[in-house]
């Protein structure tokens, strides 16, 4: 006769004892189960003991998670979490260095378990770890273990980072600023300061004032990937917490110290593969760099500004008055105004008063900046563009100013200028670190591409929007290739001619039409059962191979990874935390299990609980597109296993 549904057959182990094979009644209180297990081994005081999962992080069994125990689970009897917390915290005060080290190692092993973490925190465990960190008696392994345990306990969110004391933060800053320091300590100290900076504006200002940018540059230039990554993480956190003016000042200083060149040569083009966390921080740095353009993009031209009027005149003169010659010399004021208005029209402005064209935001003054940069950095190309088009028939001239204004809007859109940083994105473009003034340089390439495409399309003024659509496609396709330099971008985008764009469009259209043709649809319907079987096999195979996922908190992107896969018999989802840089784990080594039979539903996008918790906003859009959750039975409640897919391709 089969056992009742709420009874599971499990094994319970204890050191130096013969394991027990028992039938666990999930309806029975856990205290009663513990007493029965202890009685079988003649152990008094069952309240001093607890059950743990025998593998992985050895999580404690509680009334909240006991439904995760399944048939065949192996548990072990161990000291209750409150008593274990007390024992280890006493060990931290040992006069023996080895005793403190062993206590810290064991504490670190159990710290990921929330039940144990709460017991430690309630007994002032964070303060005791803080004392070890502040005293700094041992700058080697003991300090590294204390920092790691402190970070693990704080990760549970039971205590806010804002509660940390100023002396404690200053001491951690000292470890970052010290020259001779154990290699395992500084990445942990940097990681702790990153958390502080992102979570507390007040303490973030303290970190900003006491960690010199030069010190972070030193850490970035050490050939140690972990140290580089944590230094970059703190740098981007400091930049994100700064005001726009402070951010500009900081980035200007970093660029003067050749950080851009170092990133390009020694991080992006390093022989070692770029880690996901570093890729994310480079994306954030790129977004912050481009974000400096936002004030100009949001500011319309002021017709009463003498400086801006002079800039417009400089733009006109560079095209029509070479080498400082004044064409309007000797003319009356009215004739001179009429001549200037005509030349501004030839320059491609829609209005005789160009200030009216630049009142639109975006792109505001950023479009004027781009045009001036092009006229000064590529004067020959600029004058050739303007003079060629101003001498063509009216219908076929490519309006430089109108094109520049629209192209600036297009580039800002493609590069997400002014949008909040994503929490998950890693899609930085290497060429932005390979070039000074990268946005303006990209504009110079793009405006010449636009002129070339205009000619290839034999466009007229009525075709302006069509030309812009083609240029958008040319730029988007080339940017998606992530060229490593501006020169490579120039080569690739110029090779993508209007004819090539048409060919690609036609190929894609024919592919779509072909797949929807009646004979194809009929054949597909006939083969559907076989195809569905193959698709099912392929998907099961992919699920069995497993995938690495990033852990995402409501505050920031985490550097922790976890792995999930389907068991070979397709009955259980197996998952657990893994270290970055380590190969995919074997299913047997993963500590957590979720029976497929317990799964209720698959949720995606806004229906996922971890997306609902994060709220709305632009920064949440990409998370929403990549989010999915598995809901499952957890006792009488519904629980969730939450995922953020690595990419849209994986999500598909």
UniProtKB/Swiss-Prot annotation:
- Spell out the molecular function terms from Gene Ontology: SH3 domain binding
One Pfam family of this chain = PH_12
Asked if the keyword Cytoplasm belongs to this entry, the reply reads yes
Boundaries of every ELMO domain copy = 307-479
What's any GO biological process attached to this entry?
A: apoptotic process
**Location (main, coarse):** cytoplasm
Highest taxon in the source lineage: Eukaryota
User: A GO CC term?
Assistant: cytoplasm
Q: Where in the cell is it found?
A: Cytoplasm
Q: Which UniProt keywords apply?
A: Apoptosis, Cytoplasm, Phagocytosis, SH3-binding
Which PANTHER family does this one have? ENGULFMENT AND CELL MOTILITY, ENGULFMENT AND CELL MOTILITY PROTEIN 3
Give the protein's function: Involved in cytoskeletal rearrangements required for phagocytosis of apoptotic cells and cell motility. Acts in association with DOCK1 and CRK. Was initially proposed to be required in complex with DOCK1 to activate Rac Rho small GTPases. May enhance the guanine nucleotide exchange factor (GEF) activity of DOCK1.
Q: How does it assemble?
A: Probably interacts directly with the SH3-domain of DOCK1 via its SH3-binding site. Part of a complex with DOCK1 and RAC1. Interacts with ADGRB3.
Q: Could you identify this protein by its name?
A: Engulfment and cell motility protein 3
Give the species this sequence originates from: Bos taurus (Bovine)
């Amino acid at each position: 006769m089969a056992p009742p549904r709420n009874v599971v057959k499990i094994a319970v182990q204890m050191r130096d004892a013969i394991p027990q094979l028992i039938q666990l009644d999930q309806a029975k209180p856990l205290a009663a189960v513990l007493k029965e297990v202890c009685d079988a081994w003649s152990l008094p005081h069952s309240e001093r003991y607890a059950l743990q999962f025998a593998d992985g992080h050895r999580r404690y069994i509680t009334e909240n998670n006991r439904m995760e125990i399944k048939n065949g689970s192996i548990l072990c009897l161990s000291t209750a979490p409150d008593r274990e917390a007390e024992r280890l915290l006493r060990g931290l005060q040992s006069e023996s260095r080895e005793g403190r080290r062993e206590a810290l190692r064991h504490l670190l092993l159990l710290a990921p378990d929330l039940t144990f973490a709460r017991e430690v925190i309630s007994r002032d465990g964070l303060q005791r770890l803080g004392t070890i960190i502040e005293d700094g008696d041992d700058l080697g392994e003991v300090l590294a273990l204390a920092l790691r345990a402190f970070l693990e306990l704080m990760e549970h969110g039971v205590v806010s980072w804002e509660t940390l004391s100023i002396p404690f933060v200053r001491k951690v800053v000292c470890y970052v600023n010290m020259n001779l320091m154990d290699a395992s300590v500084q990445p942990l100290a940097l990681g702790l300061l990153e958390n502080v900076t992102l979570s507390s504006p007040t303490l973030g200002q303290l970190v900003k004032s006491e960690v010199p940018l030069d010190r972070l540059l030193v850490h970035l230039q050490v050939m140690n990937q972990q140290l580089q990554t944590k230094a970059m993480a703190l740098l981007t956190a400091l930049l994100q917490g700064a005001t726009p003016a402070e951010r500009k000042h900081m980035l200007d200083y970093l660029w003067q110290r050749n950080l851009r060149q170092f990133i390009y040569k020694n991080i992006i083009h390093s022989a070692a593969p770029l880690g996901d966390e570093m890729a994310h921080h480079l994306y954030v740095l790129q977004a912050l760099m481009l974000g400096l353009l936002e004030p100009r993009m949001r500011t319309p031209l002021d017709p009463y500004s003498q400086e801006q009027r002079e800039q417009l005149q400089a733009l006109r003169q560079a095209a029509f008055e070479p080498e400082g010659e004044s064409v309007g010399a000797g003319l009356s004021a009215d004739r001179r105004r009429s001549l200037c208005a005509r030349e501004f029209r030839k320059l491609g402005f829609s209005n005789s008063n160009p200030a009216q064209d630049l009142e639109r935001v975006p792109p505001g003054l950023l479009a004027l900046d781009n045009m001036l940069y092009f006229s000064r950095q590529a004067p020959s190309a600029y004058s050739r563009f303007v003079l060629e088009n101003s001498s063509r028939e009216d219908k076929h001239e490519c309006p430089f100013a109108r094109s520049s204004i629209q192209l600036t809007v297009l580039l800002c859109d493609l590069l997400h200028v002014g949008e909040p940083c994503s929490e998950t994105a890693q899609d930085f473009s290497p060429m932005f670190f390979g070039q000074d003034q990268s946005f303006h340089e990209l504009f110079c390439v793009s405006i010449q591409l636009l002129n070339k495409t205009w000619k290839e399309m034999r466009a007229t003024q009525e075709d302006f929007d069509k030309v812009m659509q083609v240029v958008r496609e040319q730029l988007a396709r080339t940017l998606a290739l992530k060229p490593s330099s501006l020169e490579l971008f120039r080569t690739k985008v110029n090779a993508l001619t209007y004819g090539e764009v048409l060919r690609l469009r036609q190929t894609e259209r024919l592919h779509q039409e072909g797949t929807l043709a009646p004979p194809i649809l009929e054949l597909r319907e006939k083969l559907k059962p076989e195809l569905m079987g193959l698709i099912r096999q392929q998907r099961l195979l992919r699920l069995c191979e497993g995938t690495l996922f990033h852990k995402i908190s409501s505050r920031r992107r985490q550097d922790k990874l976890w792995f999930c896969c389907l068991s070979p018999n397709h009955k259980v989802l197996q998952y657990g935390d893994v270290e970055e840089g380590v190969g995919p784990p074997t299913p047997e080594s993963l500590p957590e299990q979720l029976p497929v039979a317990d799964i209720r539903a698959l949720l995606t996008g806004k229906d996922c609980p971890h997306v609902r918790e994060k709220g709305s906003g632009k920064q949440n859009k990409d998370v929403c597109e990549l989010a999915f959750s598995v809901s499952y039975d957890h006792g009488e409640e519904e629980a969730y296993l939450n995922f953020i897919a690595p990419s849209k391709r994986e999500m598909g």
